[in-house]
Curated annotation (Swiss-Prot):
Name by which UniProt lists this protein: Beta-ketoacyl-[acyl-carrier-protein] synthase III
The species this protein was found in: Staphylococcus aureus (strain MRSA252)
Record-level GO cellular component terms: cytoplasm
InterPro entries, per the entry: ACP_syn_III_C, ACP_syn_III_N, FabH, Thiolase-like
Reactions this protein catalyses: malonyl-[ACP] + acetyl-CoA + H(+) = 3-oxobutanoyl-[ACP] + CO2 + CoA
UniProtKB keywords: Acyltransferase, Cytoplasm, Fatty acid biosynthesis, Fatty acid metabolism, Lipid biosynthesis, Lipid metabolism, Multifunctional enzyme, Transferase
Family from the record: Belongs to the thiolase-like superfamily. FabH family.
Gene that encodes it: fabH
Amino acid sequence: MNVGIKGFGAYAPEKIIDNAYFEQFLDTSDEWISKMTGIKERHWADDDQDTSDLAYEASVKAIADAGIQPEDIDMIIVATATGDMPFPTVANMLQERLGTGKVASMDQLAACSGFMYSMITAKQYVQSGDYHNILVVGADKLSKITDLTDRSTAVLFGDGAGAVIIGEVSEGRGIISYEMGSDGTGGKHLYLDKDTGKLKMNGREVFKFAVRIMGDASTRVVEKANLTSDDIDLFIPHQANIRIMESARERLGISKDKMSVSVNKYGNTSAASIPLSIDQELKNGKLKDDDTIVLVGFGGGLTWGAMTIKWGK
């Protein structure tokens, strides 16, 4: 059985926050932010818009793109670190709001690696033969856990969502190879402070980890698929920081024109990062049927996940 993406959708809130916004209250500048991160702007959800709302918008698009009905979905997995509340989960909320029927629904927390973790998890369920259309969503409202007094992190994060339907696809298409992993010894470098409820990060340590793991994990899944870097049509890394992305690209041996860059428009959107990049490349025609692509993410935990896919239904 070939398992892959049968439907796709993405959503970013309408409100756009440019770098000039932060110049009003932080010792920073548009020039510095752009140079150090690659970010020019990010989308933030309104106060009355929560993670489940973002996830819903992306899910509706993915269901329509797959040509199925909500009742055809037999499982929902949502990757998020910013659920509306601890429980019910965002997946529970989607199950009710979409009208899927009383299917299994769960949130999966692997921070910025969450979308990769959830796609890999969904693949196993479909491969078992017991499930046929699994809705996987990566959605985060990072603006609600961003410390706007912290110059090192305040400028980095945005909000958004992406969704896919994982199921059986045509011969020769779908997920080819994958890996996921974690290193809990690095958990102290990127975490949600239990007292303030805000995100804290040791940027230097996270940078070193990210450059190494994104490049190495990508290389391993390419080799596992019996491919070389020359076979890759598009490299879609987690959009955390342009310098991390460029270093990972060089480590993998991919030319600059083959790397997706959307961090300039969205900032770091955690679990939504990779699907928002996919959305951009589909719309601009850079991602086409039968393209071989590499997806890779890293996040708090510390965690990582990577996969190669032959794109198409």
